[in-house]
Curated annotation (Swiss-Prot):
The gene is pth. It is found in: Cytoplasm. Monomer. The active site is at 20 (proton acceptor). Disulfide bonds: none annotated. Its EC number is 3.1.1.29. InterPro entries: Pept_tRNA_hydro (IPR001328), Pept_tRNA_hydro_CS (IPR018171), Pept_tRNA_hydro_sf (IPR036416). Keywords: Cytoplasm, Hydrolase, RNA-binding, tRNA-binding. TRNA binds at residues 15, 66, 68, 114. This is Peptidyl-tRNA hydrolase. It comes from Streptococcus equi subsp. zooepidemicus (strain MGCS10565). The record marks 93 as: Stabilizes the basic form of H active site to accept a proton. Transmembrane segments: none annotated.
Length: 189
């Protein structure tokens, strides 16, 4: 079986460490811990790394299409590697959750997230696994765009690093157990 784990974010140094890029941060941490590296694949508009874990090929992906077009890269890679949507996991930010809270889900709507909207539109289903990382709501008077494209303050970055450690553990547990249900029971709460 082959699986694909996608972290959502925006490419380029301008967006590094922004709230909208916690999906990229999570996948970066996973590949670092596994001692693998990304290769830019211009045909698929993505950075792709891979490893064998428990006799399964796992692709780690960071689309380079910008958030709102993430589905282009995801669909192209799923098709090329013949990966089922049931073997897709997407990690992304959620502004309706408190900073640093994580939640795993099996399926669901985009919830207003443009990267998830793009993936659903391109792959034709909402039925794929997700890990949401809370980035909190904008403060009074701040636009959503300025909030998600803003960087974490020092205290929130500490909280996010703890959350990224938890996401790392959750993904590794998921890859060992091969069960989103067990992973949800273990890490949602």
């Amino acid at each position: 079986m082959v699986k694909m784990i996608v972290g959502l974010g925006n490419p380029g140094s301008k967006y590094q460490q922004t709230k909208h890029n916690v999906g990229f941060m999570a996948v970066d941490r996973l590949v670092k811990d596994l001692d693998i590296s990304f290769t830019e694949d211009k045909a698929f508009k993505a950075l792709v790394g891979s490893a064998f874990i428990n006799q399964e090929k796992i692709y780690f992906v960071k689309p380079t299409t910008f958030m709102n077009n993430s589905g282009l890269a995801v669909r192209a890679l799923l098709t090329y590697y013949n990966i089922s949507t049931k073997d897709l996991m997407v990690i992304y930010d959620d502004l309706d959750m408190a900073v640093g809270k994580i939640r795993l889900r099996q399926k669901g709507s985009a919830g207003g997230h443009n990267g998830i909207k793009s993936i659903i539109a391109h792959i034709g289903t909402q039925e794929f696994d997700r890990v949401k990382i809370g980035i909190g709501r904008p403060s009074h008077g701040m636009s959503v765009i300025n909030h998600v494209l803003g960087k974490f303050d020092t205290d929130d970055m500490i909280t996010i690093n703890i959350a990224l450690d938890k996401v790392d553990k959750a993904i590794n547990y998921y890859l060992q157990e091969k069960s989103i249900e067990k992973t949800m029971q273990q890490f949602n709460g």
